[in-house]
Amino acid sequence: LTTKQDLRDNYPFGMFAVPRSEVSRVHASSGTTGKPTVVGYTKNDLDVWAKVMARSMRASGTKKGDLVHIAYGYGLFTGGLGAHYGAEELGCTVVPVSGGMTARQVTLIEDFKPSTIMVTPSYVLNILDEFRKRGLDPRECSLDVGIFGAEPWTNAMRREIEDAFDMHAVDI
């Protein structure tokens, strides 16, 4: 069993299961509680990850041809890229907005009309606040499915999100 401490003790690349030359991508935690934990992914790992994400998205109700708004951060954090490649694997059109720029998020949702959003549950509540600040009813927007993860959230948050957007909210 590999622990987070094992990854930190062997920072940055000491726990890779293959030579670094076979690693196609590196992701890492923010390191807020210590050294970042670094994980290397081979091409095969990335292909499997995309397929797993695509299956999870399909199970949520997202389907081929849907427009997917991705508001997870892109970069060392795994969220944005995992969601991105999973959506492409499923055959969706990706809007890779990344995190932040909440006003722009709402503008793009209103203009592009995505059916699925992928984001942290706490950040979608910020997006909800922006809808309300603009006097918009989020239930009237195009979002049918919310795929949320990367942090814990409560059943009360799920109900608030589902009720506010009239969407199906799932944890990934």
Regions of interest found by a model, annotated:
Residues 1-28, 33-51, 55-59:
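Nucleotide 5′-phosphate-binding alpha/beta core
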Residues 16-20, 44, 73-74, 96, ...:
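Residue-level marker of alpha-helix boundaries and capping positions
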Residues 23, 46, 73-75, 122-123:
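Short glycine-enriched loops at secondary-structure junctions
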Residues 29, 68, 117:
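Residue-level signal for inorganic ion chemistry
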Residues 38-42, 51, 60-62, 79-82, ...:
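Short, conserved acidic/polar surface loops in the N-terminal third of protein domains
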Residues 50-67, 102-114:
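Conserved ATP-dependent adenylate/AMP-binding module captured primarily in the ANL superfamily
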Residues 58-94:
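Conserved AMP-binding loop of ANL adenylate-forming enzymes
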Residues 81-172:
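Conserved adenylate-forming
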